[in-house]
């Protein structure tokens, strides 16, 4: 099980809500994934309606909602979005996203750290999307973030763990959960992240744009379970030379 702040999760697969063809397909895929934490952008929610097309189906699923500040370009804008989410959804959990670069959607490290400090002081449980920078992740941990969410690759790129070496350092140093966010494009990428020692992964695009999102969600669920088991089992270390599985030593001694 995974504990973040005051909440325990059985699933280490977190999911997003963007890019699905329709709300029904979204809820089917999320249910198939087994995910218990689902993120959504406040900018996409119709707060004036009592039956929002995204929010209402998620509430029926019974998952924990993690509103995010996607669209914010500064720490101040992120704080405004977070307060809006807290008021509208009655949650103090927030995924901090500040990425002013519209082409690559890379997080702004300076504004992210600043925003994290502001949000923590305002009573939020903060999960920041950030670069795979070990120093930044440690600083985010020190200011009180409940977890860190370093990227594997740019958002929606499906390139996997391009930042693998840095992720390994982050995982080794972290005293809070590490959730790999962005770039996870295949179940094998999620499995690799869990084998590396990550506490969880967040997947959206790879499931939402798959030919069959429900089956892809199931595949990710299985991959996450396999990755966790592999990490717990302790995989054999790679070697540069062959090591016989059945040595001839004892056999030759008998001869």
Swiss-Prot record:
Pathway listed for it is: Cofactor biosynthesis; thiamine diphosphate biosynthesis
GO terms under cellular component: cytoplasm
Which Gene Ontology terms describe the biological processes this protein takes part in? thiamine diphosphate biosynthetic process
Which keywords annotate this record? Cytoplasm, Schiff base, Thiamine biosynthesis, Transferase
- Alphabetized InterPro entries for the sequence: Aldolase_TIM, Thiazole_synthase_ThiG, ThiG
Q: Does the keyword Cytoplasm apply?
A: yes
Annotated catalysed reactions = [ThiS sulfur-carrier protein]-C-terminal-Gly-aminoethanethioate + 2-iminoacetate + 1-deoxy-D-xylulose 5-phosphate = [ThiS sulfur-carrier protein]-C-terminal Gly-Gly + 2-[(2R,5Z)-2-carboxy-4-methylthiazol-5(2H)-ylidene]ethyl phosphate + 2 H2O + H(+)
Which of this chain's residues are annotated to bind 1-deoxy-D-xylulose 5-phosphate? 156, 182-183, 204-205
Free-text function comment from the UniProt entry: Catalyzes the rearrangement of 1-deoxy-D-xylulose 5-phosphate (DXP) to produce the thiazole phosphate moiety of thiamine. Sulfur is provided by the thiocarboxylate moiety of the carrier protein ThiS. In vitro, sulfur can be provided by H(2)S.
Give the protein name, as stated in the record.
Thiazole synthase
- Species assigned in the record: Photorhabdus laumondii subsp. laumondii (strain DSM 15139 / CIP 105565 / TT01) (Photorhabdus luminescens subsp. laumondii)
């Amino acid at each position: 099980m995974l504990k973040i702040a005051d909440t325990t999760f059985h699933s280490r697969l977190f999911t997003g809500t963007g890019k699905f063809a329709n709300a029904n397909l979204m809820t089917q895929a999320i249910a198939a994934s087994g995910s218990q934490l689902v993120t959504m952008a406040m900018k996409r929610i119709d707060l004036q309606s009592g039956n929002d097309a995204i929010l209402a189906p998620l509430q029926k699923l019974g998952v924990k909602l993690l509103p995010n500040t996607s669209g914010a370009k500064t720490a101040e804008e992120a704080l405004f979005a977070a307060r809006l989410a807290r008021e509208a959804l009655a949650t103090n959990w927030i995924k901090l996203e500040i990425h002013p670069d519209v082409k690559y959607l890379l997080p702004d490290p300076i504004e992210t750290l600043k925003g994290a400090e502001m949000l923590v002081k305002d009573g939020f449980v903060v999960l920041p999307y950030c670069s795979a920078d070990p120093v930044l992740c440690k600083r985010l941990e020190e200011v009180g973030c409940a977890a860190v969410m370093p990227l594997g690759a740019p958002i929606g790129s499906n390139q996997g763990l391009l930042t693998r070496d840095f992720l390994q350092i982050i995982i080794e140093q972290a005293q809070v959960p590490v959730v790999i966010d962005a770039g996870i494009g295949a179940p094998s990428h999620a499995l690799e992240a869990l084998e590396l020692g990550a506490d969880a992964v967040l997947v959206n695009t790879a499931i939402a744009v798959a030919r069959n999102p429900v089956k892809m969600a199931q595949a990710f669920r299985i991959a996450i379970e396999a990755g966790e088991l592999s990490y717990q089992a302790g995989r054999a270390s790679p070697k540069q030379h062959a090591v016989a599985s059945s040595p001839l030593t004892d056999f030759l001694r008998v001869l």
